UniProtKB/Swiss-Prot annotation:
Organism: Escherichia coli (strain K12)
Uppermost EC category: transferase
Stated induction or repression of this protein's expression: Unlike the aerobic pathway, the anaerobic pathway is not strongly repressed by FadR regulatory protein.
TM region positions: none
UniProt-annotated catalytic positions: 99 (acyl-thioester intermediate), 392 (proton acceptor), 422 (proton acceptor)
Entry function: Catalyzes the final step of fatty acid oxidation in which acetyl-CoA is released and the CoA ester of a fatty acid two carbons shorter is formed. Strongly involved in the anaerobic degradation of long and medium-chain fatty acids in the presence of nitrate and weakly involved in the aerobic degradation of long-chain fatty acids.
Phylogenetic lineage: Bacteria, Pseudomonadati, Pseudomonadota, Gammaproteobacteria, Enterobacterales
Family according to the record: Belongs to the thiolase-like superfamily. Thiolase family.
Keywords, comma-separated and alphabetical: Acyltransferase, Cytoplasm, Fatty acid metabolism, Lipid degradation, Lipid metabolism, Transferase
Protein's cellular compartments: Cytoplasm
Protein name in UniProt: 3-ketoacyl-CoA thiolase FadI
E.C. designation(s): 2.3.1.16
InterPro entries: Ac-CoA_C-AcTrfase_FadI (IPR012806), Thiolase (IPR002155), Thiolase-like (IPR016039), Thiolase_acyl_enz_int_AS (IPR020615), Thiolase_AS (IPR020610), Thiolase_C (IPR020617), Thiolase_CS (IPR020613), Thiolase_N (IPR020616)
Keyword Iron: no
């Protein structure tokens, strides 16, 4: 076992997570169509503060993330502070770590708490795949800058005359990695082939995810942690996630064609997480501050770890790399965990990470460790379903996972939970949570 790194303040306080909330998650261009991420962020933070009954002035910092950036609101965190009635003096800044963005936001607030610069803060993220920054071609962008500097009408007309019809076409946001040109689905296909993961295995995991998420809603387990969203023109509220298939059937999965490798692929729209809109946030504070306010924490942040690997081959292995570090820093092993919640970007990616966590060879050759991190116990794994069912508003997923895991730990009488995710750019994140 390597070095244990206790997450405590100088006074010995643990980092408490006292509350968490999210909007329902909605598939792209459905319930939240036309609502930008900043408004989703305001919605969830405003409701989180109202439910917690914590005075706004208690919150000294807000760290928030957004992956699909909107040029008109580059600092989503500050806009949320200004748009929710929080104290205008509340420090606020934005972060981005692709699909692990709200993991990063939580880590940043935790670091401020440990440094003693704040005693309470909010971390979270929001994304909209329905309100996108549609750009212009590079040639048109350059001409527009030059036109703005031109002094005469003839100079402006001369500049515009250089453009062709194709230069005027809108440019949608990139869906591929900047450095490689590979889409996330292409990487998932790589991983399915590298680790021998079949179409049947992927469909089975997706089916399991939907079944468990549907059951979680049916049992009322998510009601406390998901707000009702009132959407303009306010005719009908959104109460639950709208991607979950309550009637999920393996036979239906088998009918779908591959989405990326059309000829030989196994990754489909059904065994991948969909483009989604939503927001999620958590309130963190020092343990002593929570006691002062009479709050009973949901749980505590025991450890966290971030990792990075090469992007050209099988880059969505973040959980396999970051989990052993987070466990080591928490002074725990896989067998000590009560729950394991892994982000399901794709069924292929999820199954590959499960395989490598139990691989002695991967531990030796890739991680330089003597033994495998540990087998993943199916009875502890994604017990309420995962991102394939709930959806994945990129910056909000980590906060969803943290809140969901802490609530489930409390229902089970406490214990330790691991939340972990892969992210674009070959990044990985893992956090160990504790509930009493």
């Amino acid at each position: 076992m390597g070095q244990v790194l206790p997450l405590v303040t100088r006074q010995g306080d643990r980092i408490a997570i006292v509350s968490g909330l999210r909007t329902p998650f909605a598939r792209q261009a459905t319930a939240f169509h036309g609502i930008p991420a900043v408004d989703l962020g305001k919605m969830v933070v405003g409701e989180l503060l109202a439910r917690s009954e914590i005075p706004a002035e208690v919150i000294e910092q807000l760290v928030f993330g957004q992956v699909v950036q909107m040029p008109e609101a580059p600092n989503i965190a500050r806009e949320i502070v200004l748009g929710t009635g929080m104290n205008v003096h509340t420090d606020a800044y934005s972060v981005s770590r692709a699909c692990a963005t709200s993991f990063q936001a939580v880590a940043n607030v935790a670091e401020s708490l440990m440094a003693g610069t704040i005693r309470a803060g909010i971390a979270g993220g929001a994304d909209s795949s329905s309100v996108l920054p549609i750009g212009v071609s590079k040639k048109l962008a350059r001409v527009l800058v030059d036109v703005n500097k031109a002094r005469t009408m003839s100079q402006r007309l001369k500049l515009f005359s250089r453009l062709r019809l194709r230069d005027l076409m809108p440019v949608p946001p990139a869906v591929a990695e900047y450095s490689t040109g590979l889409r996330m689905g292409d990487t998932a296909e790589q991983m399915a082939k590298t680790y021998g993961i079949t179409r049947e295995q992927q469909d089975a995991l997706a089916h399991r995810s939907h079944q468990r998420a549907a059951q979680a809603w049916s049992d009322g387990k998510l009601k406390e942690e998901v707000m009702t969203a009132f959407i303009p023109p306010y005719k009908q509220p959104l109460v639950e996630d709208n991607n979950i298939r309550g009637n999920s059937s393996l036979a239906d999965y088998a009918k779908l064609r591959p989405a990326f490798d059309r000829k030989h692929g196994t990754v489909t729209a059904a065994n991948s997480t969909p483009l989604t809109d939503g927001a999620a946030a958590v309130i963190l504070m020092t343990e002593s501050r929570a006691k002062e306010l009479g709050l009973v924490p949901l749980g505590y942040l025991r450890s966290y770890a971030f990792t990075a690997i090469d992007v050209w081959q099988d880059m969505l292995l973040g959980p396999a790399w970051s989990t052993p570090l987070a466990l080591e820093r928490a002074g725990l092993t896989m067998s000590d965990l009560t729950l394991i919640d892994m982000h399901e970007a794709f069924a292929a990616q999820t199954l590959a990470n499960i395989q490598l966590l139990g691989s002695e060879r991967f531990a030796r050759e890739a991680l330089g460790r003597a033994h495998a991190t540990g087998e993943v116990d199916d009875s502890k794994f994604n017990v309420l379903g995962g991102s394939i069912a709930y959806g994945h508003p990129f910056a909000a997923t980590g906060a969803r996972m943290i809140t969901q895991t802490l609530h489930e730990l409390r229902r089970r009488g406490g214990g330790f939970g691991l939340v972990t995710a892969c992210a674009a750019g070959g990044l990985g994140a893992a956090m160990v949570l504790e509930a009493e």
